[in-house]
A protein has these predicted regions:
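N-terminal mature-domain region immediately after signal-peptide cleavage
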Residues: 20-267, 272-280, 285-311, 317-318, ...
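Bacterial N-terminal signal peptides that target proteins for export
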Residues: 1-9
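Bacterial N-terminal signal peptides
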Residues: 8-21
Length: 337
């Protein structure tokens, strides 16, 4: 698979807000009541802006209804990539979504995931709940597969060319105006990269409003590039060569969404990400708090976790960890820098 598509996203955070006003009206009256207040705008420069609001099930329903064809298309890609890379059938991932992940997903996000399935179905595209959960877990399946194969003494298939990304966050004397700057650079495969084009504007009944990029049919960014109405902006770079997974803990996509929705500080973000950490999609997270003009780096292994914060300085991430204990204990090999 080609893995050279670059997607660059950067925000200079001075005065950034989430006060977007829709220029489109809701769909016609015959559409489901759950769609009220939600809308999608025509594609512009390759991006599709989607506004979702309401209860967890309403937000999910709107996602599924407004993006039904795109979700079905993206699901085919995720199925192809997951089965090709792991040498396992899609039923393996559906079963893990239902029996391994679902018991550790709290009700709020269960409702939203079910809503995505219900919304797509209401739009004439039948998408099963377990397909929706498996789609949302796309970025952490490789971690589970390595764990599963090790437990069952199976040789895990290796990828020829891994994906890469890099990011930085800076503040104080390291930026032109002394305020926070954050940016992210992501090289991903052509198949999923060309579909990673949804800009979600989500106003939940509880928690913070969020603006993020993502695939169709997901509850989190996974790219990751997110900012919320409390001034918390988040990105990450994956920790390369990481090995570790706890199937009895909370999926990464649930923790990442919850952290984006409920964080009002860097400490909030770190606490939510660490609580129930399953080791899936292990990342070096970079965070900016624009209200406090503070930045942070959360290096989140399964057993080794480091949080650093600064009000003057910078942090970077580029698929390699800093924590020496994490390098020694949780990597299969030392990344070449």
């Amino acid at each position: 698979m080609h893995r050279s598509l670059a997607i660059f996203a950067g925000l200079i955070l001075t005065g950034i807000g989430l006060s977007l006003s829709p220029s489109a009206t809701p769909r016609a009256a015959e559409t489901p009541s759950e769609i009220k207040g939600a809308f999608r705008l025509p594609e512009k420069n390759g991006w599709t802006f989607v506004h979702l609001q309401g209860t967890p099930h309403e937000i999910g329903f709107q996602n599924g209804y407004l993006l039904a064809p795109e979700i079905a298309d993206t699901l085919k890609v995720v199925q192809l990539e997951a089965t090709h890379d792991s040498k396992k059938e899609w039923a393996f991932f559906r079963d893990a979504a239902q029996n391994m992940m679902w018991p550790h997903i709290e009700q709020e996000y269960r409702d939203e995931l079910q809503g995505i399935s219900d919304g797509a179905t209401a739009h004439g595209v039948k998408i099963d709940l377990w397909d929706v959960v498996a789609l949302n877990a796309a970025e952490e399946w490789s971690y589970y597969v390595k764990y599963y194969d090790k437990q069952h003494r199976i040789q895990t298939a290796s990828l020829g060319v891994p994906e890469h990304c890099s990011a930085f966050v800076a503040t104080g004397s390291y930026t032109k105006d002394g305020k926070a700057v954050i940016a992210h650079n992501n090289w991903t495969g052509y198949l999923d990269g060309e579909r990673w084009t949804i800009i979600y504007d989500i106003t939940p009944a509880r928690g913070k409003r969020m603006l993020m990029d993502g695939l169709p049919g997901v509850i989190h960014s996974a790219d990751d590039f997110v900012t919320n109405s409390a001034g918390i902006t988040i990105t990450e770079a994956t920790i390369g060569h990481f090995s570790g997974y706890d199937p009895a803990a909370i999926p990464e996509f649930v923790r990442a969404r919850k952290a984006a929705q409920y964080s009002a500080s860097i400490d909030d973000f770190a606490r939510i990400m660490k609580d129930g950490n399953n080791g899936g999609y292990a990342n070096t997270w970079l965070i900016a708090d624009i209200n406090r003009n503070e930045i942070g780096r959360l290096e989140l292994g399964l057993t080794n976790v480091t949080l650093e914060k600064k009000t003057d300085g910078y942090f970077v991430g580029s698929n390699f960890p800093i924590n020496e204990s994490l390098i020694k204990e949780e990597l299969t090999s030392i990344p070449r820098i």
